[in-house]
Amino acid sequence: MLTITLFITWLYYLLAVLLASAVYLDWRYRQLPNWLSLLVLLSGVATLLLQQALASASYDELGLRMLTALLLILAALPVYYLGGLAAGDIKLIAALSVWFEFEQLKTFLLLTTLIGGFLALIIICYNFCLTLLSFRYQSNKTKITTVPYGIAISLGTALVLF
């Protein structure tokens, strides 16, 4: 039993490393690779299975969480087609949904939305200041045209799980 608990703890550490990777990759390259979402999903499934084994419970919860991930992808498709979120963001959110109970998932989605909106406001202010300064000074800085939503997703996850 101690071994299972220790393994679950290591899976949470792995999730923290994956979230830090998501922040870096999304900030630096504006991309969240498929391997990252896949590792988040697999570690979440492993964590859930181990938790269910410890509790001697049925594995219905896994099916419900996988269904939730699928429904999140379907619900986010219109946002993707309108350019509101990138595919990597949607896949990461869906993969992370396996980690959350339903109440936690609602909190995660709310926090991620609020943090993402705050990031968007910061980028708007940055671009506005850049525009104002470009009238006075020659600047080689370019405007930021996308929001690295992986930061908001990772921070929302950390606030809920850790």
How should each PLM-predicted stretch be described?
Residues 1-162:
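A membrane-topology feature that recognizes alpha-helical transmembrane segments
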